[in-house]
């Protein structure tokens, strides 16, 4: 548990440093990192259930994507689905922590949520390609 807290603090410090630099792709992921950070203990297998903060964060991301993706009532075609997907992918790749595929796949079910975007270890964010969002281009 203590090592987990140290890793989370280190990740937040790195994120703050990276986010403060101009034109850094991570600045476009800040909201995703903050929303998904409370889920780390669950997806790493430390906790059996996601915390309420984790579920609130995933719900927030789901709402961001839901109201900006093609087919939604408030369609803006802004590329938010791809941005959120890429940010989660970056966080998973950068963390080098042992994410449990089953925990990631069960996150929506455990939070009683139907996601508007995929969360899995095999995410393919290219299926949400949107060239209209300059933030997405900076992440690629």
Swiss-Prot record:
Family classification: Belongs to the plant LTP family.
Tissue expression pattern: Tapetum-specific. Also present in pollen.
Record-annotated disulphide pairs: 29-87, 39-54, 55-111, 85-125
Organism of origin: Arabidopsis thaliana
GO biological processes: pollen sperm cell differentiation
UniProt cross-references to Pfam families, sorted A to Z: Tryp_alpha_amyl (PF00234)
Cellular component terms per the entry's GO annotation: endoplasmic reticulum lumen
Key words of the record: Disulfide bond, Endoplasmic reticulum, Signal
Gene3D superfamilies given in the database record: Plant lipid-transfer and hydrophobic proteins
Localization (cell): Endoplasmic reticulum lumen
Main location: endoplasmic reticulum
Top-rank taxon, per record: Eukaryota
Signal peptide: 1-20
MF (Gene Ontology): lipid binding; lipid transporter activity
Protein name per the record: Protein ARABIDOPSIS THALIANA ANTHER 7
């Amino acid at each position: 548990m203590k090592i987990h807290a140290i890793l989370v603090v280190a990740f937040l410090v790195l994120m703050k440093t990276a986010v403060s630099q101009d034109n850094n792709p991570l600045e476009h992921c800040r909201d995703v990192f903050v929303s998904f950070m409370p889920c780390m203990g669950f997806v790493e297998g430390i906790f059996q259930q996601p915390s309420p903060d984790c579920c609130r964060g995933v719900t927030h991301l789901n709402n961001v994507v839901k109201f900006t993706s093609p087919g939604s009532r408030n369609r803006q075609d802004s590329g938010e689905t791809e941005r959120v997907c890429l940010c989660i992918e970056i966080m998973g790749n950068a963390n080098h922590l042992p994410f449990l595929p089953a925990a990631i796949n069960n996150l929506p079910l455990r939070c009683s949520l139907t996601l508007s975007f995929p969360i899995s270890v095999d995410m393919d964010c290219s299926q949400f390609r949107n060239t209209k969002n300059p933030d997405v281009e900076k992440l690629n």
